[in-house]
Amino acid sequence: MTEVLILDIISIMAKKHPSTQAFSQAEVTKKYGIPKSVIHKYFPREQMRSIRARSGRRLSFPVWTDEQIQQLVRRSDIAKAIEQTRNDQAAERQRREAEALFASYSPDALIQRARTLDRAFVLHVGPTNSGKTYGALEDLKQHTPGCYLAPLRLLALEMFDKLNDAGVPCSMVTGEESILIPGADNISSTIELCDYTRRFKTAVIDEAQLIADPERGAAWLKAICLVNAEVVHVCMAPEALTYLERLVRAFDAPYTVQKHERLCPLTFSGSVHGYEDLQKDDAIICFSRKSVLSTAAHLERNGFRASVIYGALPPEARRNEVRKYLAGETNIVVATDAIGMGISLPIRRVIFAETEKFDGKEFRSLNTAEINQIGGRAGRYGMHEKGEVLVLGKDTAIGDKLGNQVRAIRAGCISFPREALRTDIPLSILLKVWQAMPRRSDFVREDMREPLSLLR
């Protein structure tokens, strides 16, 4: 690298300048790209040029011929200094570019952009099975074009089916697939695939308490800030209301709050001691595809007919599993926690076969929010007198946490902008600048220390 740099400087000299011509410091820097700091430190001041200033004073400054410069840049210490200085200057320039890039994705920048949109908000607040999403979806049916933004592919598919079944043509877009309906101007998608280029009459953002999720929360923050619709329905669990009210107020947009209550009571009914205690309309909760399939197979061998629901289930297979359950061809559901995010089935009892889950980093016990979300699927108003939550075995933690108030959300999450990876800025600089960005109490930055450590 150093030898290439020396030859590059010498070739510039040979093409443009006679060997007897002398150059000042500014000319050396401009014509040959040799940094001023290197000239100051390494270049001798033997030959001087004198000029008369307008004031009448004579000014003297050092000059160098191209022959002298060629000799100097061949010195290894000077060549290395030039290369290091250029690298440092490039890194500083890239650091400033990264800072400017991240500033454009900051909460302040999002809020400023949100203020330019003409929108009104309806904040739907309530526990699972309280009808908050139903009310928002009914408004979308009446005021199209609209978009529905889901936390899960399965939920996007469910709303896609509901809208089309109601005579509201709707397409679906998720990370795994797209189903485009000719003539449809409504769309159901996972929240990361929100279309920010369109103007809608109605937008429905579901499960907005996930704005605090360290992995995906930024998608909810961006959607709430930037989805372009006349009316934006934001559906959330109670713990998210205070934070999201404060966020929407920052937009200077009008908003109303609609509170929803469960119409079917929910109780903890203790334990079931084995699969022989299962009943019709039970949902067995596991936390992996493998566990779901093995549990369903065990039930089939013991006389039950089970439908299975998990996140990676293909759309047609999912439709068929739901159809079989609704038609009475199966009488039990075995599902992952995907069932907690709005998958609408007439379930009377939710039974936790497992009380720990792998969250991407470690196995841990279910928290209160997860227990309320999943357990809340039990009980359908008009079909069951109450919903019941049970656990397989003797674990009492589920009962201790069910129905407890979840700590209020205090901060939304900001993800490292993946658009930054499409720039020419080295990843190491991007990660360092990201980690050094100012901290805020109301927004939590995605922690990139682990990927940064892998680059060291």
Where are these regions (language model features)?
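Short helix-start
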Residues: A26, F43-I78
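Inter-Walker segment of RecA-like/P-loop motor cores
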Residues: L163-T197
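Post-DEXD/H (motif II) to motif III coupling segment of the RecA-like Helicase ATP-binding lobe
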Residues: A212-H260
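Long, largely alpha-helical accessory region at the distal end of helicase-like NTP-driven motors
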Residues: I409-R456
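Conserved interdomain linker/interface between the two RecA-like ATPase lobes of SF2 helicase motors
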Residues: A253-A296
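Conserved strand-helix element at the start of the C-terminal RecA-like helicase core
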Residues: P145-A156, V234, L278-L299
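Conserved segment of the helicase C-terminal RecA-like domain
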Residues: N367-V406
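Conserved RecA-like helicase motor core of SF1/SF2 enzymes
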Residues: G311-A312, G328-N331, D337-G382
